[in-house]
Swiss-Prot record:
GO terms for cellular component: chromosome; chromosome passenger complex; cytoplasm; kinetochore; meiotic spindle midzone; microtubule; midbody; nucleus. Gene3D superfamilies: 1.20.5.3600, 6.10.250.2990. The INbox mediates interaction with aurkb/aurora-B. The SAH (single alpha-helix) region is characterized by a high content of charged residues which are predicted to stabilize the alpha-helical structure by ionic bonds. It can refold after extension suggesting an in vivo force-dependent function. The isolated SAH domain is monomeric. The lineage of its organism: Eukaryota, Metazoa, Chordata, Craniata, Vertebrata. The modification Phosphoserine is found at S869, S870. This is Inner centromere protein B. Component of the chromosomal passenger complex (CPC), a complex that acts as a key regulator of mitosis. The CPC complex has essential functions at the centromere in ensuring correct chromosome alignment and segregation and is required for chromatin-induced microtubule stabilization and spindle assembly. Acts as a scaffold regulating CPC localization and activity. Residues 90-99, 332-343 have a biased composition (Low complexity).
Length: 892
């Protein structure tokens, strides 16, 4: 038996773990996969202008985004094309609200309708008092199956075209799935996939409790509400307004039934009875409905965070203006019933109203749970608050249109309805004022679970506050903006523009006139005091603005040197200004003052603690300073000792260096003495060698002179012998010539004799002997040429001047023998003598005078003094002129 229980327990644990795993897959991993698929589709779509929103932008990309205009039209941009002003003034809040509502309409049509946890409902003092008397309503059980959910009757207004398409879709769905039967007319936009997603979101698996969001100045300003989407001319664009008519909690299954949208062509505003109406301001600040599976892109992208910050800023500015007007209305207690009725008419005056049947229970309000903030969202960017879609009536009676004339007919002053209408108006106005003051007056039970709101007790007309004129103009502006935001198709025939102000003077005068007068005087006094306070605040604001202008001027002077820090400082200053403004407005309520006092006490404690820490730190620093001083003194002493030791070492080193220098100087002196001795010895040796060389040269010269004298004598003797030989030869030549002359004369005489004898004797038979004939011996046939006897030249004269062309001489076999003085000892002696005793050319030839250029170039013409050359002429410097030759130096 124990084993069976263990097995069953194990199966239960396994099933629970499996369900938790499946739920984790559905709620976490599938969401990530769907987001990744969505981003992939965006990336691979044809629209490449869209930037991935998961990536953060740098400041330069933000500035470039503002400057660069896209060629393709951007559906998220303002159609007017004007730049959004960064100032949070009351002049342009309506345009920003209009842009936000248009973006919410576009995003609401693109995203699938999913269920999300509701926001915590703010509890006012009246709600807290009412919650004590009335216990909270018990939640109904969730539907068990999708068929039970679909069998709920939902009232949807559709057009004729949508009705035909819905019928066709219904027939197709009946053929495909015969089990799917419902009374709801299908709409083309709402398919089975959407219904299955809704059922999965509200299915049986238990959802873990989400911890409540801590109450902070940022979170406490967000009011809870229901979102009701009214139809427009097209089923794609729907107007989103906030329905705040329901006060009691509503079961979760009714929230699922609220998902189908109203797609009628006529616009409607959420107005129930007059007692259940809320301020028109709440209908403007709307938010997109998001689910528990909210898009990660909208949660973590910078674009969504910037949009949420813009919405929060607009909403805070609206709440600030409302709180100011509320403070003025609370201080001034005007008791006129006409102001009461006019204020009621200002609150509930709208273009068209859509009311619920009288039988509809007013307690059906869904219970709102606190939404957990994402851990990845920063303090600057807040996650979107999830607003549930308002509940449609479960009654079978269809919604009916009510105009102002119908309300006036219903509100005719009968004895029964007059008091009811007055009470309803009182309740409506008190509830509107309470709802407007939710953000500025938090109650003690703000974090407690919401309870049912009981109607306030009847309020006399004297307690109702007349709104100031600027609120009337504000409501007029709201109505005009609502009218401008509508599409042309959404304006039907039943829409009529009425005035906000209605003069509803009460019929019965109040009998307590004296009390009223006293209250009126008190109200006037309070109003004057409030006016004085307002003027003082205005003066303070002016002073603060002057100080801010002064700071801005100083910033403008510093921005040239601090270009990069200036942008960050401006952003920080803007953020601080907004925070200061919001903090100043929040400080008007007593709760904030109490918190501030508590904070001041805590600050005093922290300051005391900080002072103690500073004193302790100062003591520690003093001790550390003393210890450091001691260490410094010790370090200085060690340093002085080191310096003294270093000086002593330097002195020893200097003495060593001086001793070394002395030793080196002594060695140098000894070396110089030794070198001088060596030089003297070498000089003496050189002089000895020179003397020996001179003596040897002298001996050689003497020997050469002797040889030369001997050669001269031999030459003279040779000349004498030659002279004698020449004279003897001349004498012999004369004798020979004289003998020849004598012989010739004798021959001539003999011939003459023979000729004479021949002439006398006969010549015919005479035989002549040629050999012995004197004719043959009379002359020579070829006489020898006469040669001039060559005179014997000087042996030292080699005819170098005459025969200077010796290039053909062979050095090994010269034509003339080399003389003795050109080789051998004579040549060496001549060279050594010329080396040691050079010839004094100046003494031999005299001093050579420098040439005078005036004498060489005696022409003087003007054109000679002009330089016609393009070259740059520079005279040589005077310091270099002594290097020039004497003959080439210029004389000045």
């Amino acid at each position: 038996m124990n084993d069976a229980e263990c097995l069953s327990h194990l199966l239960q644990v396994c099933s629970r773990k499996t369900e938790e795993f499946v739920r984790t897959l559905d709620t976490k991993h599938m969401v990530w996969l769907l987001e990744i698929e969505e981003e992939a589709r965006k990336m691979f779509s044809s629209d490449f202008n869209a930037e991935p929103e998961l990536m953060p932008k740098t400041p330069s990309q933000k500035r470039r985004r503002k400057k660069r205009t896209s060629i393709l039209p951007d559906e998220n941009r303002d159609p007017s094309g004007r730049r959004i002003s960064r100032r949070r003034s009351s002049a342009n809040w309506s345009s920003s609200v209009r842009r936000l509502s248009v973006r919410n309409q576009i995003k609401a049509n693109d995203d699938s309708i999913q269920e999300g946890p509701a926001q915590p409902k703010r509890m006012t003092r009246a709600r807290a008092q009412a919650s004590i008397m009335c216990p909270p309503a018990v939640e109904q059980a969730l539907p068990e199956s999708p068929s039970q959910l679909c069998q709920k009757s939902v009232q949807v207004k559709i057009s004729e075209h949508e009705r035909r398409s819905a019928e066709q879709k219904l027939r197709e769905s009946e053929i495909e799935d015969s089990e799917m039967k419902t009374d709801v007319q299908p709409i083309p936009e709402i398919t089975k996939d959407h219904i299955s997603e809704i059922m999965n979101a509200a299915g049986p698996p238990p959802i873990p409790d989400i911890p409540a969001v801590p109450v902070t100045p940022e979170n406490k300003s967000r009011a809870a509400g229901k979102l009701k989407i009214s139809g427009s001319s097209t089923p794609i664009q729907t107007a989103a307004v906030v329905d705040l008519t329901c006060e009691s909690p509503r079961p979760a299954n009714e929230l699922v039934n609220e998902q189908p949208l109203n797609l009628s062509n006529e616009s409607a505003t959420p107005t129930g009875s007059k007692s259940d109406r809320r301020s028109v301001r709440r209908s403007l600040v709307v938010r997109k409905s998001s689910s528990r599976r909210a898009s990660l892109v909208s949660q973590f992208s910078l674009v969504s965070k910037r949009e949420s910050m813009t919405r929060e800023a607009v909403r805070k500015s609206i709440r600030q203006s409302i709180s100011k007007k509320k403070a003025a209305m609370e201080t001034s207690s005007t008791s006129s019933q006409r102001s009461c009725h006019s204020s009621i008419e200002m609150v509930d005056d709208e273009i068209t109203i859509k009311i619920r049947p009288e039988t509809a229970p007013s307690e059906t309000v869904s219970e709102e749970a606190p939404a957990a903030e994402s851990p990845r969202s920063s303090l600057r960017s807040r996650a979107f608050k999830k607003i549930a879609i308002s509940n449609l009536s479960e009654s079978e009676e269809p919604p009916r249109r009510v105009t102002r004339q119908m309300v006036a007919v219903d509100a005719e002053p009968t004895p029964e309805t007059a008091d009811d209408a007055q009470n309803n108006r009182r309740k409506s106005y008190k509830r509107a004022v309470d709802e407007l003051s939710d953000d500025e007056r938090p109650s003690e039970g703000e974090c407690s679970p919401p309870r049912k709101k009981t109607p306030s007790p009847p309020c006399p007309p004297s307690k109702i506050v007349k709104p100031p004129p600027h609120m009337k103009s504000f409501l007029h502006t709201v109505q005009k903006n609502q009218f401008l935001m509508m599409t042309p198709g959404s304006i039907g025939k039943n829409i009529t523009l009425k005035s906000f102000i209605k003069r509803n003077t009460p019929l019965k005068p109040d009998p307590k006139s004296e009390e009223k007068e006293r209250q009126r005087l008190d109200a006037l006094r309070k109003k004057e005091e409030a006016e004085l306070q307002r003027k003082q605040k205005i003066e303070e604001g002016k002073k603060r603005k002057q100080e801010e202008l002064k700071l801005r001027r100083e910033d403008r002077l510093r921005k040239v040197l601090q270009a990069r820090e200036r942008v960050e400082q401006l952003e920080e200053e803007k953020k601080k200004k907004f925070e200061q403004k919001f903090a100043q407005i929040d400080e008007k309520s007593e709760k904030v003052r109490e918190d501030r006092m508590a904070e001041e006490k805590a600050k005093k404690k922290t300051m005391v603690k900080k002072q103690e820490e500073v004193e302790c730190r100062r003591k520690q620093e003093e001790e550390a300073r003393k210890l450091k001083a001691k260490q410094m003194e010790e370090e200085e002493r060690r340093h002085q000792e080191l310096l003294q030791k270093k000086r002593e070492e330097e002195e020893m080193e200097r003495q060593k260096k001086m001793a070394e220098a002395k030793r080196l100087a002594e060695q140098e002196r000894e070396r110089q003495v030794f070198a001088e001795k060596e030089r003297l010895r070498a000089e003496r040796e050189r002089e000895r060698i020179e003397r020996e060389k001179a003596l040897q040269l002298q001996r050689e010269l003497e020997r050469a002179a002797q040889e030369k004298e001997q050669q001269r004598r031999e030459a003279e003797e040779r000349k004498k012998r030659e002279q004698q030989q020449r004279l003897e030869q001349e004498r012999l030549e004369r004798l020979r010539t004289e003998q020849e002359v004598k012989r010739l004369q004798e021959e001539q005489q003999r011939k003459a004799k023979e000729q004479a004898a021949a002439a006398a004797a006969p010549v015919m038979n005479v035989t002549v002997d040629m050999q012995n004939s004197p004719a043959c011996e009379s002359y020579e046939m070829t006489p020898k040429s006469y040669k001039v006897p060559s005179v014997k030249a000087n042996a030292d004269n080699y005819g170098m001047d005459l025969n200077s062309d010796d290039s053909t001489d062979d050095e090994s076999q010269p034509r003339k023998p080399i003389p003795a003085w050109a080789s051998g000892n004579l040549l060496a002696q001549a060279v050594s003598q010329q080396y040691y005793k050079p010839i004094d050319a100046d003494h031999m030839y005299g001093t050579i005078d420098s040439p005078k250029l005036e004498e060489l170039f005696n022409k003087s013409k003007p054109r000679y003094f002009k330089r016609t050359s393009s070259a740059v002429w520079h005279s040589p410097p005077l310091s270099n002129r002594h290097h020039l030759a004497v003959g080439y130096g210029l004389k000045y």
